Amino acid sequence: MSDQPRGALLPKKWNENRSLRDYFDGAVFFAALLIVAFRWEVVGCLVYLGIVGAVLVLSDRISDAFLPLILMTVFVTRCYDSFDVFIRYIPFYAVVLLCVAFHLIYYFKKPTFGTSFPGLVAVTVALTLGGIGSLSAAAYFRPMNLYYVLGLGIMMPILYVVAKPRADAEARDRFTRALFLAGCLAAFAVAIFYARGWNEFRETYHALSFQSSNNLATFLMISLPIGFRYSKKARAWIFIPVLQYLALLFCDSRGGTIFGTLEFFALLVFFCFYRSDRFRRICFIAIALLIVVLAVALLPRVLTFYRYDEKIPHFSELTFRQLLRAAFTSVVDNGEARVGLLKRSFADFKSNPLFGVGLGYTGNEDLYHPVKGAMNWYHMWLPQIWGSLGIVGLLCFGYQLFLRIKLAFTRREFPEVTLSLCYAGLLLMSQVNPGEFCPFPYALIATSIFILIEPPQKVGTTEPEETAPEEPETAE
């Protein structure tokens, strides 16, 4: 096999003319809006997978496949409990996998290795050993358990080996844009849901519940920092993250509301002082003050929106101070499944401290029964680690997190800082949801973020290449 990668099968004009790729991305995003608006998720999934397969065959740039792949994961979140629907298309998925194999072979590049790779290997070891001494062989080798063990484990180092040699500045920028558009699509999906349920909403003014709320909130939290970054180039972008935050509040996701608010205000403070001009500082401060004033002035209505009038006795008779106290004290319901799963995670850890009970453990189905095709999550990142993977899992995931944090603080250029903040949003949401324990898309997104944050490496080594410093992003 030649050391030099082959050129793309597409005409040279595709690689030379960036505007063509921009038109492609625009068409893919507009089509995704139509899919969400008209509920064409199943057909859309097949079409977008077909686009991904075709792109991987025709283009030597893996970044060309980012947008259709990530947008597809946004709109299919609305297909809750649809394992039996999608499993029928296995032959089609096999064709897409052949396209992936073709891309890896035909456009082969020598692997390079950077800071985050050892963490992926460590986590793979923990996932592979998880449940030893507790989980039966039959349970360990169940297809669903293998999907999660391999998908979260060995597939991530493989993704690294494949993607790292292709991780240049353009790939980073296109991935960033794909995450941003995914957040915009998620916000649009929330708006469409409320448009369809407007009559129901007007009856109670309670937040509407829908199954994809946590997933849409996760994509919004991943995307939030990017709108702030784009506002540095054009002032009109300042209000995009505000609209995404409003969509987040309407998701009826408790984790999204709490952690999303924490993230949003942290981003306001950060971008107020990080390479910001006077106009943006004034805007960010005004936005923060406006939200706080509205939240305080409309507290009873806000609590009614989140159904606290149903949770808090004598809601209408309480004073403002009592309402505020009741809102904070009733965030966690001691009777909900997460509280039971948290307690159970300690018991599971004690039963097998070294390796945990494994990802394939089903002993918690009395507290949480997953949909077909999903594992028995604890729905919390840390309990998932110590309950499923024990001490080994804590050490390996802790090592990976240490490497990621170290890398994030080392890479201080604006594009890399933005992606680090995107990961922070995902990590926050993972504390109260499966999050990073979903191989596709969240673990894939997390791994890709740190591949793209790392500096380019010399082929076959862990030594960084010497690259010219990027021009700073300037405000218009």
Positions of PLM-derived features:
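N-terminal signal-anchor transmembrane segment
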Residues: 3-6, 12-106, 133-137, 426
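Transmembrane alpha-helices of multi-pass inner-membrane enzymes
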Residues: 30, 54, 264, 418-476
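Helix-loop-helix junctions and helix-breaking kinks within/between transmembrane helices
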Residues: 34-45, 84-88, 143-146, 211-214, ...
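Aromatic-anchored transmembrane helix interface
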Residues: 89-100, 117-132, 140-163
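Alpha-helical transmembrane segments of multi-pass inner-membrane proteins
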Residues: 131, 157-161, 170-200, 210-274
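A membrane-periplasm/extracellular boundary helix in multi-pass inner-membrane enzymes
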Residues: 194, 246, 250-251, 274-326, ...
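Long extracytoplasmic/lumenal interhelical loops at the membrane interface
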Residues: 202, 207, 327-389
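Hydrophobic transmembrane alpha-helices and their immediate junctions
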Residues: 234-236, 273, 279, 367, ...
